[in-house]
Amino acid sequence: MENRVADELIHLPLPEVQAVNVINVRHGDGDGDGENGWERHLDDEQMQAMRLENPQVAMLLDAPHEPPIELHHMLEPVNVPERPRKKRSFLTISKPFHVQPERCALISNGWRAVQCVQPEKRGECFANYLIKHMNSRNYPNGEGLPKRWGQY
């Protein structure tokens, strides 16, 4: 038995292009080639036939006119280099002024004294420091002590 290639060809029924369906129109858009330029308008059947006959033309006709917009580039902020900052003299640079909380000398000294103590014993040591040092010898006539609760 011999393997023979079938002599039958597959024919797709394509609509015939008729001269009646093709319309030639002068391309007179005022750019100077109105006399020589011609446009050819094809109906849907003729366009389909042309696409089937020539796949390269079909790819060109189906291709988008512009490259696709990639949105993931627009979602990220664009890194713009910063302008070089003006060099300023250290004498003219203002620094924030930190206001010291208003405390009497006894409280400030007591707080400084308990900083080296373990955190769980600080409250007890602070109270002992206040009792030991709040006397008339350190603060004669109550000078430097708060006049009322919550003043310092």
Curated annotation (Swiss-Prot):
This is Male-specific protein scotti. The gene is soti. It comes from the Eukaryota. Transmembrane segments: none annotated. GO terms for biological process: sperm individualization. It comes from Drosophila mojavensis. It holds the Pfam family SOTI. Post-meiotically transcribed gene that has a role in late spermiogenesis; required for actin cone progression during spermatid individualization. Keywords: Developmental protein, Differentiation, Spermatogenesis. Belongs to the male-specific scotti family. InterPro entries: Soti (IPR031397).
